[in-house]
């Protein structure tokens, strides 16, 4: 996203996670225009330092569905971010929150769909070869 000219800011409680952001970059995250803030998405100060008040898009992508839901609601309701996306691993929860107006991405559902497609393609290939 940085390469496309977007301003990108990341909040993470693990300062070491900063190194993962630089994979594939020719220079440092900051030199490429990124901003990194140590903290959690539940900390208003960390979100403010990261620039949430200027954000057009906000993505909540922690390791916990409940945390992502709460952080996404903070971004929507308190900071009025126009587009908020929450990564939700539980397909049922992702679907329910989507019906409540929260934009969700469910990697579990995506993986299931990819597996189903692969199995169907393999099965179709076997039927053709019979």
Model-identified regions with their sequence ranges:
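Cytosolic regulatory regions of ion transport systems
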Residues: 1-130
């Amino acid at each position: 996203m940085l390469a496309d000219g977007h301003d990108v800011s990341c909040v993470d409680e693990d300062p070491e996670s900063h190194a993962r952001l630089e994979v594939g970059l020719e220079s440092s995250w900051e030199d490429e225009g990124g901003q990194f803030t140590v903290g959690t998405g539940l900390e208003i100060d960390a979100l403010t330092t990261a620039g949430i008040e200027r954000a057009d898009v906000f993505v909540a992508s922690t390791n916990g569905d409940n945390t992502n839901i709460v952080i996404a609601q903070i971004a929507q309701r308190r900071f009025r971010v126009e587009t908020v996306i929450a990564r939700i691993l539980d397909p049922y929860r992702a679907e329910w929150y989507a019906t409540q107006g929260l934009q969700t991405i469910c990697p579990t559902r995506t993986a299931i769909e990819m597996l189903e497609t692969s199995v169907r393609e393999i099965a179709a290939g076997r039927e053709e070869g019979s």
